Curated annotation (Swiss-Prot):
This is Sodium/potassium-transporting ATPase subunit beta-1. It comes from Ovis aries. InterPro entries: Na/K_ATPase_sub_beta, Na/K_ATPase_sub_beta_sf. One of its GO terms (molecular function) is protein-macromolecule adaptor activity. The sodium/potassium-transporting ATPase is composed of a catalytic alpha subunit, an auxiliary non-catalytic beta subunit and an additional regulatory subunit. Interacts with catalytic subunit ATP12A. Interacts with regulatory subunit FXYD1. Interacts with regulatory subunit FXYD3. Interacts with NKAIN1, NKAIN2 and NKAIN4. Interacts with MLC1. Part of a complex containing MLC1, TRPV4, AQP4 and HEPACAM. Interacts with KIRREL3. Interacts with OBSCN (via protein kinase domain 1). Interacts with TRAF3 and TRAF6. The keyword Iron does not apply. Its main location: membrane.
Length: 303
């Protein structure tokens, strides 16, 4: 039995290294070299085919604009202050209750201050009244970076933070800043004038994508009170000259046009649900995405 075990152990060692035939694991050095060379060439060819395929694919893709955008959803509508539960609740006589909202608006508006828009190589004045879409050429690097339209804080009126650093929260008249999310190459199409007849107090301009805020439910509409809008030229919406957006590579300092909404007479001690919607021929809404073209926020001013 001991001899059989020794014989088995010897054959195992011989398989690993056969000193007579100079074989390692049953193969000579030349055999190992040939098989390793085969696999190096084989996997090298596979890698070359893969890299070549990727390179060909990359040649068809622009780094400045997606090749296909037919399934890109319309832009979403967002409010500032940005809050997790879309609820704004505060007491006008308690600064601690609303300073989070004020700081949030402050931080967002920093890039809209005059001091941040001084460079004439980057920014340009696009007028104080709404105008047509601003075509800045093809989506490529032939013309270098594109200029960006300035947006003045003073256009936001009572909600600019210039005269009231609390944006109305100290007086129980909260401001909400509204922006349309960036979508590369998106060109807003304002609705026809006749299509807005069902929406009261909507100031029409063919070069403005209008926005309106109302109570979400019937009981909310009675409690919202008066609403003031502050935007470029006094229009409640987004002027077209700020579009289209050319992306971070061509417009790294791009500023979205803003609309400020101030609720000046909210019913106290009542949670009011408010919905704001943008209106346009290419603005859509989705039940699955409550921020697509609209948003709703709950506001409660406590005594």
């Amino acid at each position: 039995m001991a001899r059989g075990k020794a014989k088995e152990e010897g054959s195992w060692k011989k398989f690993i290294w056969n000193s007579e035939k100079k074989e390692f694991l049953g193969r000579t050095g030349g055999s190992w070299f040939k098989i390793l060379l085969f696999y190096v060439i084989f996997y090298g060819c596979l890698a070359g085919i893969f890299i070549g395929t990727i390179q060909v694919m990359l040649l068809t893709i622009s780094e400045f604009k997606p090749t296909y955008q037919d399934r890109v959803a319309p832009p979403g509508l967002t409010q500032i202050p940005q809050i997790q539960k879309t609820e704004i609740a505060f007491r006008p006589n308690d600064p601690k209750s609303y300073m989070t909202y004020v700081d949030n608006i402050d931080n967002f508006l920093k890039k809209y201050r005059d001091s941040a828009q001084k460079d004439d190589m980057i920014f340009e004045d696009c007028g104080n009244v709404p105008s047509e879409l601003k075509d800045r050429g093809e989506f490529n690097n032939e013309q270098g970076e594109r200029k960006v339209c300035r947006f003045k804080l003073e256009w936001l009126g009572n909600c600019s933070g210039i005269n009231d650093e609390t944006y109305g929260y100290k007086e129980g008249k909260p401001c909400v800043i509204i922006k349309l999310n960036r979508v590369l190459g998106f060109k807003p199409k304002p609705p026809k004038n006749e299509s807005l007849e069902t929406y009261p107090v909507m100031k029409y301009n063919p070069y403005v994508l209008p926005v309106q805020c109302t109570g979400k439910r019937d009981e909310d509409k009675e409690k919202v009170g008066s609403i003031e809008y502050f935007g470029l030229g006094g229009y409640p919406g987004f002027p077209l000259q700020y579009y289209p957006y050319y992306g971070k590579l061509l417009q790294p300092k791009y500023l979205q046009p803003l609309l400020a909404v101030q609720f000046t007479n909210l019913t106290m001690d009542t949670e009011i649900r408010i919905e704001c919607k943008a209106y346009g021929e290419n603005i859509g809404y989705s039940e699955k995405d409550r921020f697509q073209g609209r948003f709703d926020v709950k506001i409660e001013v406590k005594s």
